């Protein structure tokens, strides 16, 4: 929590290393943030530089909570696939359902580096998701400040 506050206040990315180098599989959450310093763009830049693959985890709420989510989600996954092609990086999209923080954290044993930031959801919820992943990830985590 303190590290996230420091990172955000000083605009410094932080790497939480968990001895998972070399980074051959980079994991990200599918989101609608495609800005220059977004986890999505940074993941593809790093993957291109390190000759790594990207795995994008597309986590949706259970259908009874949010039935009309698929069109936005499909647009985001299409944009991620376009980024993969333009960066000449292998990208796998994995679809899952449930709590974003818990599902992504449980997925980190299959990747070497997770790239996260506060999500575009409400500020406190996005921060809690990032904190949970930082504490529970089995891979190294690169936190990108907003």
Residue ranges of predicted features:
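Gly/Ser-rich helix-loop-strand patches that form or flank binding pockets
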Residues: 1-22, 108-146
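A short, acidic, amphipathic alpha-helical segment used as a generic capping/interface helix at domain edges
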Residues: 76-81, 96-108
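Small/aliphatic-rich secondary-structure junction motif
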Residues: 9, 21, 25-69, 81-90, ...
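Amphipathic coiled-coil/heptad-repeat helices and related helical stalk/stem segments
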Residues: 39-40, 100, 125-129
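Short, flexible/disordered intra-domain loops and linkers
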Residues: 1, 63-71, 124
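Short, conserved glycine- and acidic-residue-centered signature motifs
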Residues: 35-36, 73, 130
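Aromatic/hydrophobic pocket-lining residues that form π-stacking "cages" and hydrophobic walls in ligand
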Residues: 3, 43, 80, 104, ...
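Conserved transmitter core of two-component histidine kinases
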Residues: 91-95
């Amino acid at each position: 929590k303190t590290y996230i506050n420091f990172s955000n206040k000083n605009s410094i990315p932080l790497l939480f290393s968990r001895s998972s180098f070399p980074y051959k599989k980079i994991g990200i959450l599918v989101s609608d943030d495609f800005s220059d310093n977004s986890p999505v763009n940074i993941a593809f830049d790093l993957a291109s530089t390190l000759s790594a693959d990207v795995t994008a985890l597309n986590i949706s709420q259970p259908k009874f909570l949010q039935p009309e989510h698929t069109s936005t989600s499909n647009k985001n996954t299409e944009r991620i696939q376009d980024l993969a092609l333009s960066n000449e990086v292998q990208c796998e999209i994995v679809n899952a359902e449930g709590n974003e923080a818990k599902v992504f954290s449980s997925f980190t044993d299959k990747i070497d580096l997770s790239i996260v930031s506060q999500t575009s959801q409400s500020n406190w919820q996005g921060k809690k998701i990032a904190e949970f992943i930082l504490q529970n990830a089995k891979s190294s985590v690169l936190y990108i400040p907003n």
